[in-house]
């Protein structure tokens, strides 16, 4: 018979600020490394003579590993304990960051980026699970905690290009990876004060499910990235897409029969859960893909320096900070549905405003979508995350958060692959890719808003 395990943080033992601050470090470093790399792509390309497809792999190697392993990490958190997994993730991420900074060619950098993704995949679900279990007794406090945690990640992903531009200006692109190490050390040391979360030591581990999910996502991303280089008529491309679809079906069949699946399909019986997962997919795919193309646009089309390009992204940081502060207050007053719909509406307007981008567009015109897009994201994401956790039992919070973040990271990798492929072909292709990414993103957000309006019940 299992003995009850103490909750992640005993009430009144550790302060609200300490728990949120410690767990947020994981989201900060993991999200920072999504966007900070984008601003360094031209410099990395020069150092390693890398074309756009290799640059896509440098970005997507991280997000693929992140997405592939996060489902297992959610189950591992439920199995081993969230605190333990959080600490392990911080250690792996720190070592991988040092390796990225010391990499000697594109292949070595891609390899260490995979290791970074493994570290991130263990940190994120465990940190969110710690938050959920720490404040499960107080919905308002849990909402505030998740909003602040989300805000930290949102601000870091928006601040990544700015920090990257400054570090490259002061030193070189390698510093964008070394900067993670102090954050990781702080997270490791602070995590020792957290109490362990509820565990389920008798829970199994779904190895067949993990392997088929890894093959499914990797085959899909590889086919999309190499599409421009090889052409769709190449059997590697259409064969890869067909193979990925077959493996997805096999994965779902395995999960349906598995005793301890990494993707519990019964969670998808909830309409709330389904529309929120779809929304997370759309938001990440749109944002990651668009920022990737905008980074190329700023430096390869508008000819901004790394520092100028980084500073040009400053409105994204400002927009995230403002909207996240507003989001928690709106949730406390209106629940989750209204802030989500408001955020999606603002995001739609922001992506449509990006259609003005041309080869000679002045920055003051770009400023408008640059601040509106993150404001929409910042309003919508915290209530989305809160709603996901509110729709599952406390003991399944690790798995639920892993599903949310897995699908979001997978969507981010696909967004970079698709939008990046459209940008492969010089300045004209990059400008065209921005317009297409804006239309696709706006369309996805419109669909999300309609689904949220129809199905989501406030929590």
What are the residue ranges of the model-derived segments?
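12-transmembrane solute porter fold
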Residues: 16-29, 37-39, 235-243, 247, ...
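Extracytoplasmic
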Residues: 18-60, 123-124, 128, 291-295
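Extracellular/periplasmic helix-loop-helix junction of adjacent transmembrane segments
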Residues: 40-70, 108-110, 307-312
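Membrane-interface helix termini in secondary transporters
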Residues: 43-45, 74-75, 79, 166, ...
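Helix-breaking motifs and short loop linkers at transmembrane-helix boundaries and internal kinks
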Residues: 47-49, 81, 102-108, 171-172, ...
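Central cavity-lining transmembrane alpha-helices of secondary-active solute carriers
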Residues: 60-74, 124-128, 314-326
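Helix-loop-helix hairpins in multi-pass membrane proteins, especially solute transporters
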Residues: 78-208, 394
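Hydrophobic transmembrane-helix bundles of small-molecule transporters
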Residues: 147, 169-279, 304-305, 311, ...
